[in-house]
């Protein structure tokens, strides 16, 4: 409770600045919830009482009205207990971490594809050394076809297929960890020079 302590004369509770920071934090959390798709929202531990307010905020397109509705959503969120809000924050953080890891894995596969197209057999040999179960002939043919398609300005069918094969290989054999090892080895050899 806010106010002065009668015995000590000190202020009790959070300061106005602290209350504003907490209110803005809940407002930001509400914005994140509104930005989610219905499928993503269903995975979160959001109380049923907040769902209509979130849906209403999504429906409103006028800037000022949308902001007013977000403030109304934040007001209802402040009525929820701190454990509920903490559970929502934790779930959102876990979702963003998972999404970041997935994006990083895709970027690693794309780097492998670009290395295969740029360096050819050298990169292919490194890939096959790390992952002997990979089909050398299929990879070599896809690299050759992708280079040919790029030179002739054709649709990138083999380029996409090469990505699919590398992604499947990464999921089956853990290309992500092998790729980071190879990149670490490359940077170490470059540092030695």
Swiss-Prot record:
It comes from the Bacteria. Residues 1-10 have a biased composition (Basic and acidic residues). Residues 1-20, 171-193 are annotated as: Disordered. The keyword Cytoplasm applies. It is found in: Cytoplasm. CDD domains: YjgA-like (cd16331). Residues 178-193 have a biased composition (Acidic residues). GO terms for molecular function: ribosome binding; rRNA binding. One of its GO terms (biological process) is assembly of large subunit precursor of preribosome. GO terms for cellular component: cytosol. The lineage of its organism: Bacteria, Pseudomonadati, Pseudomonadota, Gammaproteobacteria, Lysobacterales. Keywords: Cytoplasm, Ribosome biogenesis, RNA-binding, rRNA-binding. The keyword RNA-binding applies. This is Dual-action ribosomal maturation protein DarP. Member of a network of 50S ribosomal subunit biogenesis factors which assembles along the 30S-50S interface, preventing incorrect 23S rRNA structures from forming. Promotes peptidyl transferase center (PTC) maturation. It holds the Pfam family DarP. Belongs to the DarP family. NCBIfam families: PRK05255.1-1 (NF003593). Its main location: cytoplasm.
């Amino acid at each position: 409770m806010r106010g002065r302590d009668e015995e000590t004369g000190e202020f009790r509770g959070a300061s106005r600045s602290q209350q504003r920071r907490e209110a803005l934090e809940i407002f930001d959390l509400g914005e994140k919830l509104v930005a989610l798709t219905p499928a993503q929202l269903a995975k979160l531990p959001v109380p049923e009482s907040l769902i209509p307010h979130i849906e209403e905020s999504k429906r409103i397109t006028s800037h000022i009205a949308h902001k007013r509705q977000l403030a109304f959503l934040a007001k209802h969120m402040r009525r929820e207990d701190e454990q509920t809000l903490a559970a929502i924050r934790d779930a959102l953080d876990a979702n963003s971490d998972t999404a970041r890891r997935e994006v990083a894995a895709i970027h690693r596969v794309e780097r492998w594809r670009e290395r295969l197209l740029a360096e050819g057999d050298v990169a292919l040999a490194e890939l096959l050394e790390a992952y002997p179960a990979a089909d050398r002939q299929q990879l070599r043919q896809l690299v050759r076809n992708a280079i040919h398609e790029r030179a002739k300005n054709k649709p990138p069918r083999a380029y996409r297929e090469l990505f699919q094969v590398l992604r499947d290989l990464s999921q089956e054999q853990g290309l992500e960890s092998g790729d980071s090892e190879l990149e670490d080895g490359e940077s170490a050899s470059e540092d030695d020079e």
